[in-house]
Each structure stands twice: as structure tokens, then as C-alpha cells.
Amino acid sequence: MRHLIIFAALGLICAGCAFTQDIDTSRIELPALESTDYIVEYQGYVSSYNALTKTPDWVAYELTKDETYGDAVRDGKYFSPDERVLLPQADDYDYRGSGWTRGHLAPAADFRWSDEAMWETFHFTNCCPQDEDLNNGMWNTLEKKCRTWARKFGKVYIVTGPIVGENRYGTIGDSHVVIPDAFFKAVMVQSGNRWQSIAFVMQNRSYNDNMQNCAMSVDELEGMTGFDFFAAMDDETEALAEKGYRLSFWKL
């Protein structure tokens, strides 16, 4: 059985919110948690699930060099609701015939180190309606870059999620799963004694663009999303790391 911990204040699940003091908030990959967050911790990632949109608000995880290798494969795996999340979720019927693909936030390919951990990426708590060309194209290229960075620096901290914005695409299915306007990804690594970060925003459409044009500082992304990324870092280190980015450092 897959390992899952669903955290709720005082052990109670309320309509649309849960919070825990038990999750290790010193984990660098986690944004600052809010009292209204419904936090679901899996073997390899953490999801802040939103029962209104039927998608995560964000997914965060640490990816090490060793974890980029392994024998687990995605063949035969399929998306399903997480039965232990006692909130409304999407299901497969919502996506069928919608014109939108089931887009992983924590990609299955980052979890080759464990078949069980890879299975856990196939929950709708880790999924958003995504343009198929984006999913197979620029977004996939960025996910591969993250694995390259994990191998180069030994470890990478990743936070990724949807941006609803004006909700210009509406919803899909009987569950009214909200289609994001765009997607974000924030990345942090330690190189020597310095921390370096970069962020990306990609619109939910096909791209024939350069990834450099989607890049921004984590500070800029925080302004767009309202999230405080990498909140466990001390304030001075975080501020220095997040205020800018160097494309040459990331080989973009």
C-alpha cells in the first residue's frame, strides 16, 4: 500500500481545509503554510490540495542526483482519485474528451527510484488540465532540465503549480475541474556556499518560444502567486537567492 499522511488540525477534517503542525516545515522545498492549506504528504512529494479547483495549489519536493536514476516505469500506471483525501476530487471521466491532458505537477519521471513513489504521482492531487503540446513540449523540457540540475548540483528543490488568473479556459467535467491559465515552477539549488534560484511561468498553450523568455526571479513569481517559496531558509539567505537569476548559471 502506498504511504500517505493527511494532516488535519486536531485530527478533524473540515470543509476544504486542513493544517498540521506535524509536517517538517524546515524542509527547504516547502512554501510557507497557511492555516487554510489542505496538506497531503506522499512518499516523494507534498501537495497543497484545493477542493474548489480540484487541483493542487502547489506541489513541492526535493530531487536528489540518485533519485534521477532507477528502474520504475510509468507503463500500466493511471490516474485515480486518492481515496484517503476526504474532499471532492477530479476523476478520469472529467478529462475524457475534454481536449486537455492529465498534467503531472510532480512528474512521474522524477520518481524512477521507487515504483511505489511513482504510483503516488498518479493521483489527481498531483494533476491539472494541461495543454497536450505544452505537456509534451516546453514543460517536459523544463522537467528534464530539473533532472539535469539535480545531477549537476546533487540536489534540487522544486515547487510547481497552476496559475488560475482570469480562468479564461473555464472548467472540465462534472467535477468542474478548473483549467489553469498558466503553470509555474520555482527551483533552488546550493552551489558551493551559495544558493541560486530561478523561476518560470508558462501559459497553458503550445509554445514555439525560448525557455529563457519564460524565466524570472523567484521574487517576481512570489509577487504573481502570493506564495512565500522556500520559507524555511533564513531570511537573509532567501532574500539574496531569490532576488535575481543568471541564465548563464542555469545554462539556458
Description of each model-found segment:
Residues 1-4:
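Positively charged n-region of N-terminal signal peptides that target proteins for export
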Residues 7-15:
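Bacterial N-terminal signal peptides
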Residues 16-252:
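Domain-level detector for secreted/extracellular nuclease and nuclease-toxin modules, and
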